[in-house]
Amino acid sequence: MKRLAVSPLSPAALIVALVAVLSGCDQPKPRCTAGVGGFAAKYTLKPGQQACPDRHGDPLQGEILGLSRYNPLRGGEDDVQDPTKASLVILSQTLGDIAVDPLLKDEAHEPHSLGNFVSTEPDEDDVCTVPTLSAAEQEVPAMGASEAIHIKYEWSNVRLHVTAAYPGTQMVGDLTYTNNDCTASYSVTGLWPAVSCAGKDANGNAVADPALCDPVADPAAGRATGSGINPDLKERVACDPDILLCVLTAPPDALK
């Protein structure tokens, strides 16, 4: 019986063959998601707007936002999630702090905003969009010398850059913020994870320390670990002197 002669491929030929096979396979897109935990959010007033005060009376300039992505439940099936749909929850530190205080919490309103992604997968620009979200608000009663306040967050056009390398760690959106009779509109950029860049001067006062945003550790300077921020974003991250958080100086091209 004759045997078929098989010529062994050279290592170079094997590599060429492997590349040819892999290039013919489409990589699946990641699911729409958001970094789990806090985002450092910078609020920029839109043209023609007047700044509104934050809860403590200072101009609102930014804060930490909690974002969470989940699959809603299927209709009529309380214990089964629907993988064909995805939703996003946003909770500001301001309303979160109020909601966890038993003396201040407003049971009549939700402290978080909720909206649905347009799709469970990013679009052709690797962007996941949540066009509209429910309003988040809390009413704080007057207590002692403190006046009553009503704070409201209305989010729209929230977009996250989602790729294998950047799994929902950069976001932008529009915010309409109300504090009592003051309402203002802001453009928002957010970066995950939220990292404080608050250092101290010789008198113990909080000051901006840009080194705390560096993703590379520097044990000699007392930084045993890096910031945890993606090193690829280093050129677009800075310590904001107003909110003392490491923030995006510019969103990625996909979110502009």
Q: What would you call each of these model-derived segments?
A:
Residues 1-13:
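Bacterial N-terminal signal peptides that target proteins for export
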Residues 21-24:
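C-terminal motif of bacterial Sec signal peptides marking the signal peptidase cleavage site
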Residues 26-74, 81-85, 204-214, 219-231, ...:
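Tryptophan-anchored aromatic micro-motifs
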Residues 192-198, 230, 249-254:
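N-terminal targeting sequences that direct proteins away from the cytosol to non-cytosolic compartments
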